[in-house]
Amino acid sequence: MYISFILFSIIFIFLGVIENFIINKRVLYKPNFLLYSEKKNKKKSTPEQVTTRVNKDLKEKKRKRPRSKILECLLKEKVEKVEKVEKNSDENQCSNVDKEIREGKRVPRLRVRNTNNHIYASIIDDYKKYVLCSTCSRDATLSKILGTYRRKATNRVINNGRTIKSAWEIGKIIGKKALSKGIFKVRFDRARHPYAGKVEALAEGARAVGLLL
């Protein structure tokens, strides 16, 4: 009886080894019922655990984008902030800004448009579909601030709106215009433009003056 028991066990082990070779699995000298029991005991990861794992991987991949050296130098400069306009002042009552915007109940939108040669900024009241104030690097009065250059295609002298410094100045100008009208907070709408280069410089220039983005 003892010899027959050993023979049967050896035959079962041999059959298990052959089965593993056929299925292209690694050879395990264990009976089949033990293999199935181990598979059942394995815990499946929940969807929450999967999402947390994916988020951790994304955070590790993300790296902090370094700012440009020109913008860092501009941020170190001392900028004169615009004095806050009182809510019930005569200038505020005559302006085209609603009382809800001045009190902060409704927040207008700072729309930015960036091209190769120029940058545009305008503050829009989406409720009334009205432009409250705007500025751009094409304004002839800003030639001394932004600087000029001669365009080869047209042989015309135009404002230099291609640099980070020009975007910084445009940001300061739009910020001063907004604060003088009683607008202290805006939503920054950069559209399809990435938050880098001139777009970032414009936003930081508006913040430097005292405008909340």
From Swiss-Prot:
Could you list this entry's UniProt keywords, alphabetically sorted.
Apicoplast, Plastid, Ribonucleoprotein, Ribosomal protein, Transit peptide
The places in or outside the cell where this protein is found are: Plastid, Apicoplast
SUPFAM superfamilies under this entry?
Answer: Translational machinery components
Supply the InterPro entries for this chain: Ribosomal_uL18_bac/euk
User: Which parts of the chain span the membrane according to its record?
Assistant: none
The UniProt entry, under Pfam families, shows: Ribosomal_L18p (PF00861)
What's one GO BP annotation on this UniProt entry?
A: translation
Q: Is Plastid there in the keyword field?
A: yes
Q: Which GO terms describe its molecular function?
A: 5S rRNA binding; structural constituent of ribosome
Q: Which family does it belong to?
A: Belongs to the universal ribosomal protein uL18 family.
Which PANTHER family does the entry link to? 39S RIBOSOMAL PROTEIN L18, MITOCHONDRIAL (PTHR12899), LARGE RIBOSOMAL SUBUNIT PROTEIN UL18M (PTHR12899:SF3)
Q: Name it.
A: Large ribosomal subunit protein uL18c
Origin organism is Plasmodium falciparum (isolate 3D7)
